[in-house]
């Protein structure tokens, strides 16, 4: 998994949120993450993984928010999945803005090449090509507050049936590495309602963790 983050003004992010959420700031900025990764062993609890359904690339555009109770979490501006059924399931089951896309992840040594071309359920032609080179592991003593702000989130917010909802996200802390962006050509942020980002992005990479997303609850 690769985390690619940019600063945005809080007002720009707040304009894209429902009224019951507030853009969370760090160092005076709201933050948006572009996160391409490979989903593996995806399954409903108590059921077996299916080779043709349980492994697929995904790329998310997300931001960081608080609700009226002060609970921190994620708000997704878009989620692209390389399989149609998970995209439909994410929309129907969680109210998340999933899109079905033509996607791939290529691994060559310390290089990761992510490709995404949106097919259906959304603006045609939206894309993301990202080439990333992994660096040294990030030691626990090198993790700062911003790193945890951007990567350690244990709740997602959504709207189900017109009502505010949330789901708990369980995982151990991400084992992180430094990363360098070799190439990026994307318009997923624009398709999600954002202007083009300014400045160099902040990158982290991870070998991944096992994640469990609970059922949604009305907030």
Regions found by a protein language model. Name each.
Residues 1, 60-219:
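Internal, well-folded beta-alpha domain core
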Residues 1, 7-8, 12:
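A compositional/structural signature for long, glycine/proline-rich flexible linkers
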Residues 1-2, 21:
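Active-site acidic/histidine clusters and adjacent loop/turn architecture
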Residues 3-5, 26-27, 211:
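Terminal catalytic/cofactor-binding subdomain
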Residues 7-8, 46-49, 88-89, 194-196:
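Short secondary-structure boundary micro-motifs
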Residues 10-59:
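Glycine/small-residue-rich interface belts in oligomeric ring/scaffold proteins
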């Amino acid at each position: 998994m690769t985390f690619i983050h940019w600063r945005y003004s809080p007002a720009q992010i707040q304009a894209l949120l429902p009224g019951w959420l507030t853009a969370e700031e760090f160092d005076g900025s709201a933050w948006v993450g572009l996160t391409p990764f490979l989903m593996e062993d995806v399954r409903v609890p108590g059921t077996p993984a299916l080779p043709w359904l349980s492994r697929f690339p995904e790329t998310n555009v997300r931001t960081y928010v608080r609700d009226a109770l002060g609970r921190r979490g994620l708000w997704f501006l878009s989620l692209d999945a390389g399989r149609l059924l998970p995209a439909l399931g994410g929309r129907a089951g969680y109210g998340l803005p999933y899109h079905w896309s033509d996607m791939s992840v290529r691994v060559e040594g310390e290089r990761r090449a992510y490709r995404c071309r949106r097919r259906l359920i959304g603006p045609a032609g939206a894309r993301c090509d990202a080439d990333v080179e992994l660096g040294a592991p990030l030691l626990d003593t090198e993790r700062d507050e911003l790193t945890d702000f951007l990567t350690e989130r244990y709740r997602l917010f959504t709207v189900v049936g017109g009502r505010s909802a949330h789901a708990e996200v369980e995982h151990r802390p991400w084992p992180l590495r430094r990363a360098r962006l070799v190439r990026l050509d994307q318009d997923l942020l624009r398709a999600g309602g954002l202007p083009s980002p300014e400045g160099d992005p902040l990158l982290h990479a991870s070998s991944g963790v096992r994640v469990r997303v609970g059922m949604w609850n009305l907030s």
